[in-house]
Amino acid sequence: MRPLAEALNARGWTVRGLLLPGFGSDLDTLPFRRAEDWTRSVRNALVELRPQHGPVMLVGISMGAALSLRAVSQIPIDGLAMLAPFWRLPTVAWPMLPLLRRIFPILRPFRWMKLNFRDLQVRKVFQRFFPRIDPDDPQTPNEMRKFKLPIGMFDEIRRAGTAAYQAAAKVHIPLLTVQGTQDGVAQPRMTRQLLRNYAGPVRYAEVLAGHDLLDAMQPVWEQVRSLVLDFASRLEPVPIRIT
């Protein structure tokens, strides 16, 4: 999110980045986190910002977009930008996760994968989620194959997405959604399904890209940047209602 944060700050926005519980240096706690922990973190940040700043815009990418949608249904702000919003996978297994977490509690996601850490994209992805690994250590691929994740964590992601879909019908603030046409994670048809449930005004833009829309080295970056900055420039602060 840093390139976008810097672009917004250069336009005069006060920017606050948010690291969700269980990510970054807190990764060891990820298996024990729940969807409510992530949503509460976003909501608390909005509670702090809303009295001091206006307009207030929330920007979320991937699962963060779904969490943002849920949060703004509870805390009124002025605008929401969702980039590559991930809220569910169109697979048979997805709605079965509550059952699967009881039958197969542990998953080794990289057990059968060929992990080539000489590939810059592979290094980039793994270092984003596992900042403490050494990609140059020849033992790292073997260690990653032993890495275990509880199925329950994926079920919490499912719960967060379901909550976002249900919240969409209650949100009326302006919304920008940027979707990669080649995104295999947050698939375009799933994003369009989510937006059909949204109650407020929607600006929807598809770009020729995959899931990572914030890589400043990719050709699509300038387009994404321009879309968000233009959307932000049109927002007007909504008066805070004191009850």
Go through the PLM ranges and name each one.
Residues 209-223:
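Catalytic histidine-centered segment of alpha/beta-hydrolase-like enzymes
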Residues 149-168:
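Active-site nucleophile elbow and catalytic-triad environment of alpha/beta-hydrolase enzymes
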Residues 1-26:
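Short, surface-exposed "cap/lid" segments of acyl-processing enzymes
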Residues 63-147:
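Alpha/beta-hydrolase-fold enzymes
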Residues 171, 177-179, 183:
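Short beta-strand/loop motif that positions the catalytic acidic residue
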Residues 26-57:
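Catalytic nucleophile-loop/oxyanion-hole region of alpha/beta-hydrolase
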Residues 16-17, 192-213:
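Catalytic histidine neighborhood in serine/cysteine hydrolases
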Residues 184-190:
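Conserved alpha/beta-hydrolase "acid-adjacent" motif
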